[in-house]
Amino acid sequence: MKRFLVFISLHLFLFLLVIAYQAQADEEWTIDRFRDLSYARVSGEVTHGDSLNFFISTEDNCNQVYNNFTFYTYEKPGDIKQLLDKHIPIKMNGVELTAKVISVSPFLMGYRVSFSLGKFPIKEYIYFLNEFYEEFQKYEIEIIDGIDFKAAKYFDIRTNNWKLDKLIPSVLEANKLCKTIEHSDS
């Protein structure tokens, strides 16, 4: 019996150690290019597959950042595609806004829904967003109910948050990458 308890205790300790390590994991940004744009992307903390994206296009002379995010959902209502091009109510750190649904696509056992927050001048936007993040010590988006819209019908997990400690250097690096695309492809 004593061996069994030691065995269970050791496994429980290892399990908790792995969980603690995952909870302390650093934010990891992906900075890359695709065709005529570069991007900086960070994964969500609640649902790792949800991403917060900052796209920079050569079409805008690498001066604008297009900010969007994705939510994955297992919910499969028959009318999920009707969300396309709709403005869905969200809360960003408790502030009520809307985000435009730009795509709904089958993914794994559910759907990936992409939302647009808009296009903004790069430096002004990322410094504003960084101040917003530092003020609240978080960057959280919650999909909420609205007029004729029940969030739970479409999204099983309605909240995610992202670490933005490396926002400024990551987006500025993507901006530099965009400028190399412009020069090398022109």
Where are these regions (language model features)?
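Classical Sec-dependent N-terminal signal peptides that target proteins to the secretory pathway
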Residues: 1-25
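A generic "folded-domain core" signal
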Residues: 23-186
